[in-house]
Amino acid sequence: MTAREGRAPLARCAVVYGVVGLAAIAGVAMWSGAGWHRGTGTAGELPDAAAAGGAAAAPPQAALPASTGLPSSLAGSSAPRLPLDAGGHLAKSRAVRDFFDYCLTAQSDLSAAALDAFVVRQIAAQLDGTVAQAEALDVWHRYRAYLDALAKLRDAGAVDKSDLGALQLALDQRASIAYRTLGDWSQPFFGAEQWRQRYDLARLKIAQDRTLTDAQKAERLAALEQQMPADERAAQQRVDQQRAAIDRIAQLQKSGATPDAMRAQLTQTLGPEAAARVAQMQQDDASWQSRYADYATQRAEIESAGLSPQDRDAQIAALRQRTFTKPGEAVRAASLDRGAGSAQ
């Protein structure tokens, strides 16, 4: 894999800096199973104290060091905190799903039994000896049952995203499986996501209804938007603004604008703070590309040295840790490495 292959388009990378918003319903992520977005935070929903409904994080503990039993795909990272309520029980929060999705990132490295053991250790590292420990284990088993049920669907639940009827059926099917396997955890795990998907699907149905005039479509879309809770409506407005910003960034990149010219343009459309974040992102991206290129060269030398698979992987993991020292960088590099391997 070349350094160029490791580059995400700047407009897409901007999500890390608060410039972009939600993915469209037609995106692949809508139909994926578990998919915690690691390290960089790109395009993922990060645990949020407010979203946890006032839930407190688990009592502060030292995070497990990367060398303590972490699979290579998670090297250099630490698990999200499991939230607790005021009584010390596991809080019903999306943050719990984020924790398990983080652990599931390692499923390509581990057998099912080893993955279970890994999750048990990660839970114990935060909740050992508490009532919440048993609760977290129970929720993990439920979540695994949910994912196993999804895997048994035809084509693992994949649908033709141009078939709105199939999308509706898939949504209903997944919601049913979630409620059956997760019970009262289905709402904190998937409630907000399902609401957004149903809303987006309703918009698509209106937009693609050939019996409606443009004026009627606009009227129905406006009425649908009024059904949104106030906070969701405000969030949607921000998303619309951010999508416009993405388009503008892409246009500036395509025109070959200099960093100073891009910053001046973005200051007009996004404001000085957002423009400064994009400028910083450019610098960080350039630094990343340079370091990944050097790393890829050294990794290729290790791969061609005729080492045993275990020695080769150990040396590459050590190289990755030396090269990428910021939180999440080693995980990102490992993910790019796996992508390079699958493309060969």
UniProtKB/Swiss-Prot annotation:
According to the UniProt entry, its GO molecular function terms are: unfolded protein binding
| One GO process term, biological-process aspect | lipid catabolic process
Q: Which domain of life is it from?
A: Bacteria
Cellular component annotations (GO), alphabetically ordered: plasma membrane
Give the record's family classification: Belongs to the lipase chaperone family.
Described by its record, this protein's role is as follows: May be involved in the folding of the extracellular lipase during its passage through the periplasm.
Recorded protein name is Lipase chaperone
Organism in which the protein naturally occurs: Burkholderia cepacia (Pseudomonas cepacia)
Which gene does this sequence derive from?
A: lifO
